[in-house]
């Protein structure tokens, strides 16, 4: 499929990467990664925030099947943070939950780097 950024890896690797990056972005709310990964990550994060805004049990289970179970703080994990803090923050916003800011290219391989953050 031409709309998927394959990044030279197999499907399992790409899915695992996106699950990890989505969970990490919810925890830290800001990541410094390559531009291609950030553009692909944006799609997955928008879906997770939309599920969190819906807020029902089925949406919570769908999000739980995608996100890694890591602690966001000593009091809450990723799923709780998504459904409480982030869902309330974006309840009046229809899409566009992330911002991508360009940085200089990476020194080792000249890959275009960006900062992706929650708006």
From Swiss-Prot:
It comes from the Bacteria. InterPro entries: Ribosomal_bL17, Ribosomal_bL17_sf. This is Large ribosomal subunit protein bL17. SUPFAM superfamilies: Prokaryotic ribosomal protein L17. The keyword Ribosomal protein applies. GO terms for biological process: translation. Keywords: Ribonucleoprotein, Ribosomal protein. One of its GO terms (molecular function) is structural constituent of ribosome. Coiled coil: none annotated. One of its GO terms (cellular component) is cytosolic large ribosomal subunit. Belongs to the bacterial ribosomal protein bL17 family. Pfam families: Ribosomal_L17 (PF01196). It comes from Mesoplasma florum (strain ATCC 33453 / NBRC 100688 / NCTC 11704 / L1) (Acholeplasma florum).
